[in-house]
Amino acid sequence: MRDARNCLDSRPAREINARVISTQPPSNADTDESCNAGTVAGRLEGVRNWLRGLFQSEEVDRDPRLKIICGCLLLYCHMTFYFWWQSPEALSTLGNETFNYAPAGLIQNFRWLAFMDYFQTRTYLYVQGMLALLGLFSLFYLRSSLLALCLLAWLAVNKVFFYLCDFRLFANYHHFHLLYTLVFLISSDKLRFFRCALGLSYIMSALVKLSPSWLFGEYFNSLPDKLPLLPKVNWLVTAACVGVIVLEFIGPLCWLTSIRWLRRLSFGAFVLFHIYSGVIVGFWYTTLMLPLVVAAFLGFDEPLLKGCRIRGRNIVTVGVFGVALMGGVYHFFIPGDARLTSEGRYFGLFMFDATRSVRFEADIQKGNKYWTVQVYRRWQMDDDSGENASAIHCDFYQDGRLANSFAVRQPIRDGDEIIFNPAMFASARMRIYGDPYLYYYYARELVRRYQPDRVAIRLDQRLDGHKETVRLIDIPDFGQLNPAYNPFSRNEWIQLPGDESPPAYRWP
C-alpha cells in the first residue's frame, strides 16, 4: 500500500492538474454547442440512412453493372432536358399566350400547371440538364452512389411533370425511360428486377404490333425504301416484321430457362436487333436500349428467376409491372382501332404502330369573317402529282368573298386574338399528329378563347399507304355539341370506320 501511494504521489503535478481540469463540468455554452451539433448531424445521418434504404445505394455501389445502368438513365435525362431546352415555348406560359399548348388528356383542364415564363422555363430545364451531368459525374467519382440516385429520382419527377404538360412530347422511348427509372429506383435486387423490366417492355412492345401494320407487313411495305439493307421484297419484309414480334414475345421467356446457350442466343438477338433498328428509328431509342441491354445481361449465368423471393419492397415493383402490363393491353378493351383513335394507346409503351397521312380542316366564323384552315401531314394529294404534302393553308373570306388565300407560316390573328398557330400542329410527331385529341383540344380552346359564332372541324386519316380515307371527326358546330374527351374510355364523337372501309381499318 505504501509503495502504491508513493507511486501515486510521484506523478507529475501537471498530469494531476490535467486530470482535475478534465473532471470539471463543461460550461453551458459548450454544452449547447455540442448538443446542437450532435442533433443536426444526427438528423442528417438519419436522413442519409433513410435514403440509403429507400434507394438501396449500397447495392449499386457493389455492382459496376448497376452503375452503368444508373449512368445511362442519368445520361438520358440530360439528353431529354437538352432537347426540351431548345424549344420550351409550349412548356411555359408563352405556349398558352400564343395558342401553342396541348397538355396530356389526363390534365387537359389544368392550364395553370405551366406557370413559368419562357426564360424561367428555359433556365429551369438547363439546370435539370446540369444536375443530370452532376449525378453522372458523382456516380463514378464518389464512393457512394446515393447522390446520383437522389438526383435521378428528382429528374424523373421533373420529367413526368413537363412530359404531361405537352403530350406532343410523347414518344415510346420516353415511356421506356420512365418505366426503367422507376423500377431501378424502387427495387431491391435491382439487377434481377431491371432485367424483368426489360423483358416486360419487350412483351408490351410486341402487344402493340398485333395489327395489320406489322402482322401483314403493311407498315414497312408502304415505305419507299422498305427495310434498309434488306431486299425490297414484300414477303421478306413481312417475314421480318413477324420475326420481330416473335422475338419480343419469345425472347424474354428464354431468360427463364436453365439452358445457357439459349439465354445467350436471346441476348445476342436483342443486341443485333437494336443495332439494326437504330438505322431506322435513329439515336433516341437506340441510345436508351442498347447500353441498358448490354449492361444488364453481362454475367447472365443463371436463369432470371432462380432464387428470386418476392417480398417486402419488391411487392411494390411487381405491382408496377402489373399496372404497366394492364396499360399495355388497355387499348384492346376500347372499341375501335387504337392506330386511328389513339384511345388508350399512351397507357402502354406505344411503338411505331403505323404510318399515317392526315388532313385536318377547320372552319371558323365570327361576324362577317370566315376562315378555312387546312392542315396536311404526309397527305397524298388527289391531283396528278401524287406528292405527299405536309403544309398548312388558309382561305380567308370577308362578307362572303374570298379576301386572301395563303400558306400559313405564322399565327393567324383576328385583332389581338390568335385563332390558329401552325406550331401547334407542326411540332407533333408522326405518332401524335394523327391523334384526334390534338384537334379536339384545339377546337375546344378556340371556342373558349375566341368565342366564335361557329367552329366546324373535320379529320381524315389514311394508314400505311392505303388510298382509302377514314373520317374520324366531323363536327359541324363544335360549340353547340360541346364534346368532352375521356382518356380512359370510348369517345363517341370520334367516328369508327364503317363496313365500307378496307379490312385493314377495321381492326380488330
Predicted regions and their residues:
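Soluble N-terminal domains of membrane-associated systems
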Residues: A13-R14, P26
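Alpha-helical membrane-anchoring segments
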Residues: R2, R19-P508
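Intrinsic-disorder-associated, low-complexity terminal segments enriched in Asp/Asn/His/Tyr and depleted
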Residues: N6-D9, D30
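Residues at secondary-structure transition points
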Residues: L8-R11, P212
